């Protein structure tokens, strides 16, 4: 990778294409997932920070993209990755359909959606338990939306459906720690981990039993492996709702971890209406294969958008990365 490609994505020699893919259900307030694809000697990388992320935070996403395109990933320790199906804030009938179509033995259920009544969360989790059966595993994800008292009340309410763990019930480390001390269900930290030093803070605060790691926000597979080692807690690898190009990086991380005690949140292609590859990374019998993916020209053309705005974001992220180096 040349310095020009790292510092000025608009002038590098690598192929760069932007995409916009619709979501089947609203997620984080959006209905379309956009990003930039970069092709290098090692394959394709994805740069897809959410719209609210500025250059400094996006710089880690750019580093992950460059790692995938120019450096490649560590050798895998396993050939397939167990994954969970993700159930968004939908009604019980749709939740049942999603679980049935996923083929997974673990389900992550979104709860605490803004504007929704808490009883809808109960009905959704109840439907998922009925659909996945008594041997299936259920985890719920509040995305930090509950205050401590609400989190404690809701976790106790939902645990009658036998929760595996609750992901990011509250926003701050202090709140996570208090929730963890007051409930019997394990707590996982997700949004609390976005920088290399965050896992150490989580561990020091005794705020979580599990950490959720995502490749792009942490700066790449190797950076995420260092984070996992420093943290010393069980790891769940999750996606940022990327195309199969971005998902492949998450699969590479999960494949390289010394231990993988939980199903990973990487079966998210079902949340998108299209993909940029001919053979999307979708689960078979609850597992994803460990493999690189190749962008399919026809598939990409169907979702391609003007790359200029994304090249500008990448350039700003690259400049922020250089400033922090």
Question: For each predicted feature, which ranges?
Answer:
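N-terminal capping/lid subdomain adjacent to the active-site entrance of alpha/beta enzymes
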Residues: 1-160, 277-325
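Solvent-exposed, charged interface segments at domain starts and junctions
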Residues: 6-15, 180-191, 196-212
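Active-site-adjacent beta->alpha loops and helix N-cap segments on the catalytic face
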Residues: 113-128, 146-150, 169-181, 196-198, ...
């Amino acid at each position: 990778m040349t310095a020009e490609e790292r510092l000025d994505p608009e002038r590098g020699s690598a192929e760069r294409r932007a995409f916009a893919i619709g979501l089947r259900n609203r997620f984080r307030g959006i209905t379309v997932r956009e990003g930039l694809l970069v092709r290098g000697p090692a394959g394709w990388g994805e740069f897809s920070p959410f719209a609210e992320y500025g250059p400094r935070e996006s710089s880690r996403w750019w580093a992950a993209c460059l790692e995938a395109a120019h450096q490649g990933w560590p050798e895998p320790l396993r050939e397939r990755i167990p994954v969970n199906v993700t159930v968004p804030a939908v009604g019980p009938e749709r939740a049942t359909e999603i679980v049935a179509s996923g083929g997974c033995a673990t389900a992550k259920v979104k709860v605490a959606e803004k504007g929704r009544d808490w009883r809808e969360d109960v009905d959704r989790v109840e439907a998922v338990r009925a659909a996945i059966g008594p041997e299936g595993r259920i985890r719920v994800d509040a995305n930090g939306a509950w205050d401590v008292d609400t989190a404690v009340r809701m976790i106790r309410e939902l645990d009658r459906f036998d929760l595996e763990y609750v992901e990011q019930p509250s926003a701050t480390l202090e709140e996570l720690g208090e929730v963890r001390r007051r409930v019997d269900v394990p707590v996982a930290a997700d949004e609390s981990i976005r920088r290399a030093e965050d896992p150490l803070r989580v561990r020091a605060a005794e705020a979580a039993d599990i950490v959720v790691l995502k490749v792009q926000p942490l700066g790449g597979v190797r950076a995420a492996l260092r984070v996992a080692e420093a943290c010393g807690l069980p790891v769940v690898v999750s996606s940022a709702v990327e195309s199969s190009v971005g998902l492949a990086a998450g699969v590479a991380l999960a494949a390289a971890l010394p231990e993988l005690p939980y199903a990973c949140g990487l079966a998210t292609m079902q949340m998108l209406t299209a993909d940029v590859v001919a053979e999307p990374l979708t689960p078979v019998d609850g597992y994803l294969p460990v493999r690189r993916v190749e962008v399919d020209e026809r598939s990409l053309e169907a979702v391609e958008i003007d790359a200029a705005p994304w090249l500008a974001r990448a350039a700003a992220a690259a400049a922020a990365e250089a400033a922090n180096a």
